Amino acid sequence: MEKNKISIVVPCFNEKEALPLFYNKITQVFNQMSQESETAGLSYELIIVDDGSMDGTLDVAKELTVNDSGVKYISFSRNFGKEAAMYAGLQHAVGEYVAIMDADLQDPPDMLPEMYKALMEEGYDAVGTRRVTRKGEPAIRSFFARKFYRLMSRISKANMVDGARDYRLMNRKYVNALLSLKEYNRFSKGLFGWVGFKVKWLEFENVNRVAGETKWSFWQLFLYSLDGIVAFSNAPLYIASIAGVLNFIVAIAAMLFIIIRRLVFGDPVAGWASTVVIILFIGGIQLLSIGILGLYLSKLYLEAKDRPIYLIGESNIEKPTEKN
């Protein structure tokens, strides 16, 4: 660990157009902070994690290293996902303080001085950011995002804030806590809340990306949310169990109704349609329960194989520093 240094982790996937704009903006912020008395002694490093980009993002990262020794890059052997990219960046960061930022400038670099001030003067271990509006985002995505955060807050022990971004500044204690969680199926928004510590939240208006297109489709976000639920809650298993108990109670009640009607009124209950509906209903509940169990078992299977979270194709950093 290097004292008085801020490491900026920037996960990138096909961000060739946005990366130079991000670099210009973040260096402006660095220069401004270096001129202020409170932050004059800080040094910086920029860790660009190329997550298997196919548009020349790695070439741009290499160009930035030519004139700036503070720029580091890690290039994966293939696309491993943003979660892996963030984890790799945290492992290789040497700074006493570490920030995670997206390259599309949807995470305003101008907030960095205020975040650092909160760590130093107010005693926080991490400063997170959250969007107070979702301007420019499809309405249906905003609706489901809000519902997801509300649901996760109720069914899990991870403190998840609505509108929270991955953009945050953390001290070394907080970073080491995250690095101690070596699970393969990572859901960082949940992990940030699970580790606890003293966290301050700063709010900002939503900003559209400066270049390129979002890499997250609605379907990908849906699957990502399922991963989060499975990773941090047993609620789906409880729901499946409760559904099974309710089905059993309904079946017993129906059986008693048929027996009583036959014995008391001598009127047998007929009708194949009702029988088919009941069978389909119970079968649907069974398939749903099997699917829920399958999700949990598949995650256990991936964890049991103990494969690395990512593989590096090339980098100008010698080795990880997760034990700092």
Stretch-by-stretch model annotation:
Residues N14-E17, Q106, D110, L179, ...:
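Residues in soluble alpha-helical coiled-coils and helical-bundle/repeat scaffolds
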Residues P11, F76-R78, R168, S241, ...:
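Short conserved micro-motifs on helix faces and helix-strand junctions that flank
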Residues Q28, Q32, E63, N67, ...:
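Conserved amphipathic alpha-helical interaction elements at protein-protein interfaces in regulatory
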Residues F76-R78, K82-H92, Y97, P109-L191, ...:
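Acceptor/aglycone-binding surface of glycosyltransferases and processive sugar-polymer synthases
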